[in-house]
């Protein structure tokens, strides 16, 4: 059925298919090897930087003797002083840039301010209802002549509402330094809420 030429063609097709498969497999293997080498190289660089950064964070202590040295060592052990010295060295030689400072209130301050707001709302509600109750004791003729007194909240207290369940309110103070044009920084207070 098959002749000699058909058998040769089949063998030729089979050898070309296996060669194409081998070249694809070798190419895939080289790409995989290059990716593995790059990952190892990045890991080595990361570990080197971590190790190098860890060594520089430890403070260098100088050896000294005498009474003045004990006081100097006691002062250097305070964390506040170390932060000041560190910030001084970090900011040395850098020009001042326009910046934004965000300061958040602590939870205790927020709890007291929210409590004060609720008390203020209750007080204002009492003020609106007390004149109405006082007018009821007057004669009916006088009551008809007087217009009802409405007490409106200011815009500051109107924007503050009671907290919702599962919502955290926080207040930020944003200080904006506008550079050389406006030498005094300006601050803005902004409230926002976050869901838990």
UniProtKB/Swiss-Prot annotation:
Q: Which GO terms describe its cellular component?
A: membrane
Q: Which UniProt keywords apply?
A: Membrane, Transmembrane, Transmembrane helix
Concerning Pfam families, the annotation shows: DUF4642 (PF15484)
- Is Glycosyltransferase found in the keyword set? no
Among PANTHER family, the record links this protein to: HYPOTHETICAL PROTEIN LOC690352 (PTHR37882)
Query: Which sequence ranges are marked TM in the entry?
Result: 26-46
Question: Which positions are tagged coiled coil?
Answer: none
Record organism: Mus musculus (Mouse)
Q: Output the superkingdom of the source species.
A: Eukaryota
Q: Which InterPro entries match?
A: DUF4642
Its topology with respect to the membrane? Single-pass membrane protein
Q: Where in the cell is it found?
A: Membrane
What name does UniProt use for this protein?
A: Uncharacterized protein C2orf74 homolog
């Amino acid at each position: 059925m098959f002749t000699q030429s058909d058998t040769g063609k089949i063998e030729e097709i089979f050898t070309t298919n296996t060669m194409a498969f081998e070249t694809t497999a070798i190419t895939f293997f080289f790409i995989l090897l290059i990716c593995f080498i790059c990952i190892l190289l990045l890991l080595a660089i990361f570990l080197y930087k971590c190790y190098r950064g860890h060594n520089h964070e430890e403070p260098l202590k100088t050896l000294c003797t005498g009474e003045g040295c004990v006081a100097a060592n006691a002062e250097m052990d305070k964390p506040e002083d170390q932060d000041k010295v560190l910030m001084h060295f970090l900011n040395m030689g850098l020009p001042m840039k326009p910046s934004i400072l965000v300061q958040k209130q602590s939870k205790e301050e927020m709890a007291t301010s929210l409590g004060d707001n609720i008390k203020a709302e209750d007080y204002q509600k009492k003020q609106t209802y007390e004149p109405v109750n006082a007018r009821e004791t007057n004669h009916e003729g006088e009551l008809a002549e007087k217009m009802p007194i409405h007490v409106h909240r200011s815009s500051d207290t109107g924007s503050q509402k009671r907290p919702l369940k599962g919502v955290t309110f926080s207040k930020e103070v944003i200080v904006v330094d506008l550079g050389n044009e406006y030498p005094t920084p300006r601050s803005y207070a902004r409230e926002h809420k976050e869901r838990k």
